[in-house]
């Protein structure tokens, strides 16, 4: 069976909600990430067999978002494309699907990633098609309906963050401390240039021909325990989840070039990493935030690894309650989200899985480390995980 390798990886900066990347639709951001990943791989465009791109909030994005991104990146019209919606796991699931296709012999070289523009999510007015009756009517936010509200219990994902914190006995201070560390690590990474190699700058056209360049993640900022302690609970009275210790609404994209080892050799493309194992896990929807524990355990078993043998973990910080997963698995703090996570950097939901993988690859290389695992929880009670080994 062929090995699967990653030969190119890039991401856009993560834009703040209604921030610098807001003028660009998700497929535009996806095209930029795809183009950069391909350029870094050195692989000719006509050698790509297929494209998978994650995208969650698709209302108003237009037909076939992945196809839009691929053609926007300059890929030939002969390349088939698939849009993946597995909520926050979409970007990583795209890479997992690419790996499976290659192992099955259905393709030899695939672009996979994710993209999201939460700034451009529309509002939904139900009932207009058939005519509204007398009385008040609700306009719904597509970010909430399609991305951030539990389809089963009807509660915001933040209530799942509350539930996870309760299950893991995490106090408000525990979560605020976790958030402060995330901000500190993200700011340190920015200042040291740790993100520079993985990010492709984005030129955003504006009025009267003015072009604005976005070159770094927009949401990391200075904060403190005292500052976070002043914030009110965001999702329930007396709760522990706040705007300061939760992830943000964001825009961004990430892409990777995935190939069989044989195809990479044929194309003289230098692998960044080998894909070792992948796994998924599902449990009660309201405990989605804790699902990465199960997914990571499955990947460890399939890879024949232990927690102690893994150099770096990138686990999505949808909420600071993800600290419960770190504690449950016994992951050392110094190996966990070493450059900060979504609490500080942001969470463009369809892109985050690919973004975490890109960040993991560059972090392994910068530190001279080999083994890494990336994992994300996702709405509905699931999680995805992937193990890689740097080459």
Put a short name on every predicted segment.
Residues 1-61, 65-73, 77-80, 160-172, ...:
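Conserved active-site "lid/cap" helical segment
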Residues 10-12, 23-24, 29-32, 174-266, ...:
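N-terminal extracellular/periplasmic Venus flytrap/periplasmic-binding protein-like
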Residues 55-109, 151-159, 222-248, 327-355, ...:
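Conserved catalytic cysteine-centered active-site region
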Residues 86-116, 165-194, 255-262, 326, ...:
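Active-site-proximal alpha-helical scaffold in enzymes
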Residues 109-163, 167:
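Flexible glycine-/small-residue-enriched beta->alpha junction loops
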Residues 160-162, 198, 206, 276-344:
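Active-site pocket-lining segment
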